[in-house]
Amino acid sequence: MTDAISICVDAVALPVTGVMMTNIAPSTSAPIARLTAGLLCLFTCAALILQSYISVGWTMRDGMGLADSLWRLTGYFTILTNSLIAISMGMIATSSKGPKVFPNHALAALTFYITTMGLIYHLLLSGGRNLSGLSLVGDLGVHYVVPALMLVWWFCFANKDEVKFGHAAIWLAWPLLYTSAALLRGRFENWYPYFFLDVDKYGLVQIGLNVLGLGLGFFIMGLAFVVLAKALNGLAAKPR
């Protein structure tokens, strides 16, 4: 799986490097931004369909019905965040405004969410998983390729002049909303999507500490992302 991840990273790094060497400023061409957003939307949808098909197959083999298996999918931060990317990119692709259909800080938030999701998955959840075939393709798609492509798209086409340090705190709203819903759902369904939210196994105190740690991690990552946005905006504003 490490080799496959390296291939994906190399495939994304090449176009990013090319952009950095040629033009650091985001493209102002709405048609190109809309076209690439549409392609990203289609790819994200394909990755979601494949990953959902695989996940539903696993749960149904364990005896769960189709409806319950589909419902369980909605409990994963990965599925929900990838869905946000697909919907947002679809809206950009179909709007005459292009990226301007969203505020600049909202596009930064979407990029922050999906890239942080990929990082958390890689650090906390990917270890010990021996995937192959379509399972590996689906896993790489939603956890690595979509985050990388979204980062590239944001880098190339989104303006970054509205991104402020205060947004790092505001951006905590989505992960906190998800965590609250996941804990509430787990209380009634006796199922938690991630081990670090499993109250039944680790108790409320430990899960509270886990949530605080993750929240702090999200906030620090948010600050780092704001610094990146400001740095890119400064480079784009420099006369050439």
Give the location of each predicted region.
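Membrane-interface helix-boundary motifs at transmembrane edges
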Residues: 95-106, 159-166
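N-terminal membrane topogenic signal
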Residues: 24-40
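Alpha-helical transmembrane segments of multi-pass membrane proteins
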Residues: 42-59
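Alpha-helical transmembrane segments in multipass membrane proteins, preferentially the mid-helix core
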Residues: 147-163
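Membrane-interface loop-to-helix entry segments
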Residues: 77-80, 135-148, 208-212
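Juxtamembrane "helix-exit" motif on the non-cytosolic side of transmembrane helices
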Residues: 55-60, 122-131
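Non-cytosolic membrane-interface motifs at loop->transmembrane helix junctions
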Residues: 64-72, 103-105, 129-142, 165-168, ...
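Membrane-interface transmembrane-helix boundary segments in multi-pass integral membrane proteins
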Residues: 32, 75, 189-224
